Amino acid sequence: MELSVRKLQVASALAEHLPPSLARPMVKVASGAFGHRSADERLVIERYLRRIYGLVLDGVTPDPKKQTWPLPEDAPITEAQLEEKVEQVFQSFGRYWLDALRLPSLTMDELDRTFTYEGLEHLIIPAQNGQGVVAAIPHFGSWESASRWLVMTHNIPVAAAVEHLEPPELFDWFLTYRRDQLGLNVIPVGPTAAVELAGALSAGSVLCLLSDRDLTGDGIAVEFFGERTTLPGGPALLALRSGAPLVPVAVFVQGNNHHAVVLPPLDTQRHGRLRADVQRVTQDVAHALEILICRDPTQWHVLQPNWPSDFAALGLPQPGWVQAEKEKGRSDA
């Protein structure tokens, strides 16, 4: 889906001014149309749903003994139900955009009425005591809604790392939107990001870090839903260095409302060398994200290949880390 500033401006105006009873059916139609013309994205979604539900993938039936995640409550599912869930992911992705673009028009009371939560004390108590918190979040549900809710209803500063987008004017639009309209401290990924993120933590911010995809190619190798891949090491590194609690968080859309789930802090005590601790904690992040995602896999918005076998299924070159591991294995043999 090709985005432009003009398209987002129009979509934002419609989202803010149309009542949800009109906007949501429109988004549902648009999401369905996008899904039907997005063959690669459909394949990626189908593949990760097969992983999560323990279905045959690449001709292989998964071994339940090697499964590190809880199957969703509605498992097992049929192939027909799998196809329905692929459609639901696209619907959820459209709903994410609608909710995000509507946020600036909501009052504090309107936003607060839509929120329920569990485990919030793991985040709120340290934040209210002035301690920074690292929130490891997946591309899931509506994390911006929760960030805005924390800012408006609890007066807790929230910072977030964001990836660069092309063209530059589109990236600038997102920065302005998240900073000025949502009240977030937005830190672009780049050479100074690590220093800025550490500064936000030391200032007592809740630091939201998307942790389910390695966008830079230099992440940490972990087991994630049954296959080795890489995830960002930043959340673990920041928590280990700063002493800030690291909490896995997901925000679920439930009808007209949102439900935030905050898991207990992960073990970020130093156990050995920093590199080994970062690997250990990042693996713990992966397992925690598995638990959160399995509560409703159709709200996970990963539309790009996330495992080496996804790249192979799409006919794409393997990520660089795969070849590096192969070469290391040969040199160690």
Spans of model-derived segments:
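Membrane-anchoring hydrophobic helices of lipid-metabolizing enzymes
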Residues: M1-I137, W173-Y177, Q181, R330-S331
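Non-catalytic C-terminal accessory region of glycerolipid acyltransferases
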Residues: R37, E83, E87, A127, ...
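Active-site metal-coordination segments of metallo-dependent hydrolases
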Residues: R42-V44, L165-P168, T229-P232
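Short Gly/charged-rich anion-binding patches and loops
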Residues: V44, E121, S145, F174, ...
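Catalytic core of membrane glycerolipid acyltransferases/transacylases, capturing the structured
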Residues: Q88, N129-G190, G217-I220
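Short, flexible loop segments at the rims of nucleotide/cofactor-binding pockets, characterized by
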Residues: D109-F115, H164, G183-P188, F225-G226, ...
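A conditional alpha-helix N-cap/helix-loop micro-motif detector
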Residues: R113-Y117, F140, P167-P168, I187-P191, ...
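Conserved beta-strand termini and adjacent loop/short-helix elements that scaffold enzyme active sites
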Residues: E118-L120, A161-E163, I187-P191, L263-P265, ...
